[in-house]
Design a protein with these regions (language model features):
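A structural motif corresponding to the C-terminal end of an alpha-helix
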Residues: 50-58, 76, 137-138, 169-175
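Structural recognition of alpha->loop->beta junctions
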Residues: 103-108, 160-175
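Active-site gating/metal-coordination segments in enzymes
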Residues: 59, 65-158
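H/E-rich (His + Asp/Glu) clusters that bind or coordinate divalent metals
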Residues: 174-191
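Short loop-to-alpha-helix "cap/lid" segments that border enzyme active sites
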Residues: 157-167, 186-191
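Histidine-centered divalent metal-coordination motifs
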Residues: 1-4, 145, 179
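An N-terminally biased module of ancient metal coordination in phosphate/nucleic-acid-related enzymes
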Residues: 1-59
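Short hydrophobic/charged patches on amphipathic alpha-helices used for structural packing
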Residues: 49, 98-99, 132, 164, ...
Length: 191
């Protein structure tokens, strides 16, 4: 997954983060100090391509948030694949968004941030099942944040053990755990 760092997206705050925990520079500035700030006129897409080239990355997956991802994928389809970002709190809208973006933009994946939703939506919550079923139907992998979240939000919705039931109920679902599943890496590998 690749994110475009630009002045508009550099201080994204998930809706579940309390006001006092939103940070001055970014949502995790209590852990990460002196993070560079992108200027308005920086070309985030070209900088990303340059960084990909420098690191031997041929193609990258970008989430359809803001305008940069779609612009990048349309201008450089050989370099960028698109991913739909959904909030399971509105189940039918999430399913429709997956279908619409897959048809219009040929998205290659779906993602959601369980502890970033407001209210939180656990990995194994009933609201996620229509999303998983749609991913199986369209042959799309789903990227789900797993383990302790970076922002100061409650992490139970992302507990790695919650994948067990989902894996059992959806044997054909391709799941990609994001953010390392820490501190339950061994459990993640077993699942």
């Amino acid at each position: 997954m690749i994110g475009f760092k630009d002045a508009k997206s550099s201080h994204y705050v998930p809706p579940s983060v309390r006001e006092g925990d939103q940070g001055d520079d970014h949502v995790a500035d209590y852990m990460f100090k002196d993070v560079p700030v992108a200027a308005e006129d920086d070309d985030a897409i070209q900088r990303t391509i340059d960084a990909m080239d420098a690191n031997g990355v041929t193609r990258g997956l970008v989430t359809l948030l803001g305008s940069k991802a779609l612009t990048a994928a349309e201008a450089h389809p050989e370099r960028f694949l698109l991913c739909s970002d959904v909030d399971p709190n509105n189940v039918m809208a999430a399913v429709q968004k997956i279908r619409d973006e897959h048809e219009r933009h040929q998205t290659k994946a779906v993602s959601f941030f369980p502890s970033g939703c407001n209210p939180h939506v656990p990995i194994d919550d009933a609201k996620t099942y229509p999303i998983y079923a749609t991913c199986v139907e369209l042959n799309l992998p789903v990227f789900i944040n797993a383990g302790v979240p970076g922002p100061r939000v409650i992490g139970d919705a992302q507990y790695v053990g919650r994948f067990d039931t989902v894996c059992y109920d959806f044997p054909d679902l391709k799941i990609v755990m994001r953010h390392g599943a820490e501190p339950d890496e061994k459990l993640a590998v077993k699942l």
